[in-house]
Each structure stands twice: as C-alpha cells, then as structure tokens.
Amino acid sequence: MPDIIPYDRRAAVRYAHRWAFSRNPLFYDFEEIGGDCTNFASQCLYAGTGIMNFTPTYGWYYINPENRAPAWTGVEFFYDFLTRKERTPGPIGVLANMSMLLPGDFVQLRLTKEIFSHTPIIVDIDGPPTLDNILIAAHSYDSDYRPLSTYDFQEIRFLHIIGAYKPENRPIFQ
C-alpha cells in the first residue's frame, strides 16, 4: 500500500500568487482552446505535491500539450482523479463542506452549463469560511485574492486535499 505524503499548501498558494496573472512557460496556455483554469489548478497542486501519475488516460500528468492526462486540464476529470478510490500515485482529495476548507484546497463551479466548468484554488480564508471570505486565484479569467462571492454560479463543490500517494519503490527483480 502506498504511503501518503503531506500536501505543501503554502507551496501551492505561493505558486498560485506567482502565476495568477501570467503563464509559466513550462506549461502550455489552454486559454484559447477551452480555458486554462484546470491546467493552472493542476500546476498549483503539483507545486504542493511534486507527484504526477503517468497512467495513460486515468492518470494525472503533463509532459506537453499533446501528452497529458485528461485530469490535468479537464474539470470533471480533475475531480474524478482526486476523489478516486484506488490508491494510485498522485494527489488525493475529498469532497468537502465549507468548514473543512484551507488555503490550497480547490473550488469547482458550475457556471451556466450542465457540468462543472471552473476550478479555482483557494489562496486565503479571511475569517470564518463564507463565500465572501474565501479568496481564490484562477486563470480564465485571471484573478488573485478574488472573493468567491463575486462568481455567478449555479452550483459549487469543494475539494479538500489530503496529501498524495507516493509511488511505491519496487525492486526490479523479485
């Protein structure tokens, strides 16, 4: 069974502040082809865990724009990967209520479509957790320290990050 390593929330939030209004050149900007929000969320999450899962289709990884997992850039796939039951390498999270949230956790919003379509990262909670006090950073549209209450959404869900499953070190010969 893989070990769980802690999530470095401060590293994830620092990354969010650093790149909220610009783009890290190591990653493609998906703004013009569906939006960059979950790509940015994944970058922040990776900054806090340092672990990717290179399983084709069902993993969570980015090598280049043509070689990435659907969970790296897709809102629903991101949710499905984080809340998976399998103990495979990579970040893990749970569906949470507002009282469980901490900086470094994620919000997913269903704006006007039938599906969730936006994934900001929580960068600060200014007092008791309310929509006014939860401050986020995001791409598509770029923002930092934006109150969650400023979004017009149909539905909201929260993802609390627990840590990450560490890849198992297996001997080559058994």
Predicted stretch roles:
Residues 50, 77, 90-100, 141, ...:
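Mature, Sec-exported extracytoplasmic domains of Gram-positive
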Residues 121-174:
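Glycine-rich, aromatic-bearing surface loops/beta-hairpins
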